[in-house]
């Protein structure tokens, strides 16, 4: 199952090649999907390649081959009956590409999207940085809105007064900026990740718990990197 952004990118690439025969650049793909940086496009392409939807062609700049399309796509029947892969060539030395085609919408019937669960994060004492995709969860579309998202399982009780409990799953919108008061995933010294409320104390950054048993921690701005902000929460009752 593809995430919404993975599906949008795959269909954008396919439709663009069908309509104009001109490959979209990474900047055009980034703009079409409303992502903040091209690194997000690289991650989406890698995920599509791992799932067998596209293939990168060696020794050719930005050349991709579309192998198949999602079953829910309107043209899925054509894919199953002799679909001819679209090859995207690099544009080095070629005339500039025209503006990107309109971003394809996900299937109207889709009520939820798959969001990768990247691991466990501390709502308490920071634990090792989270980097592994454990599995995917289904999240209602209206919960997350636009942007790139991932999920984390909560360990600890430092955010209980914000309604975040041990064992909850939080939905995070990927990004490197935050406003004071946002609940964020903060990476400390490139080693430890924690979920806290973001504050500024002069030139420093304060990571504030929502539990009086935990002290607010103050760091220099060069020691903290914002990895995303909280946009939703899922709780299972046993």
Swiss-Prot record:
Active site: 158 (for autocatalytic cleavage activity), 196 (for autocatalytic cleavage activity)
E.C. number: 3.4.21.88
Origin superkingdom: Bacteria
Annotated site (Cleavage): 123-124
UniProt entry keywords in alphabetical sequence: Autocatalytic cleavage, DNA damage, DNA repair, DNA replication, DNA-binding, Hydrolase, Repressor, SOS response, Transcription, Transcription regulation
Function: Represses a number of genes involved in the response to DNA damage (SOS response), including recA and lexA. In the presence of single-stranded DNA, RecA interacts with LexA causing an autocatalytic cleavage which disrupts the DNA-binding part of LexA, leading to derepression of the SOS regulon and eventually DNA repair.
NCBIfam families membership: lexA
Subunit structure: Homodimer.
Protein known as: LexA repressor
Record gene name: lexA
């Amino acid at each position: 199952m593809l995430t919404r952004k993975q599906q949008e990118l795959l269909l954008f690439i396919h439709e663009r090649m069908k309509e104009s025969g001109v490959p979209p650049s990474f900047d055009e793909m980034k703009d079409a999907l409303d992502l903040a940086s091209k690194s997000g496009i690289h991650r989406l392409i890698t995920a599509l390649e791992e799932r067998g939807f596209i293939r990168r062609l060696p020794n050719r700049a930005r050349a991709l081959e579309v192998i198949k399309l999602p079953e829910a796509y309107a043209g899925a029947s054509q894919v199953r009956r002799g679909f001819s892969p679209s090859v995207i060539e690099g544009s080095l030395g070629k005339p500039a590409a025209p503006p990107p085609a309109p971003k394809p919408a996900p299937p109207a019937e889709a009520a939820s999207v798959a969001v990768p669960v990247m691991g466990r994060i501390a709502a308490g004492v920071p634990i090792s940085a989270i980097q592994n995709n454990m599995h995917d969860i289904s999240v209602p579309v209206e919960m997350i809105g636009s942007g790139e998202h991932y999920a984390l399982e909560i360990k600890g009780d430092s955010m209980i007064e914000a309604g975040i409990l041990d064992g909850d799953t939080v939905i995070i919108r990927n990004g490197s900026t935050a406003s004071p008061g946002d609940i964020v995933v903060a990476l400390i010294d490139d080693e430890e990740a924690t979920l806290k409320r973001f504050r500024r104390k002069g030139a420093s950054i304060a990571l504030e718990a929502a539990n009086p048993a935990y002290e607010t921690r103050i760091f220099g701005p060069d020691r903290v990197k914002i990895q995303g902000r909280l946009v939703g929460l899922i709780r299972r009752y046993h």
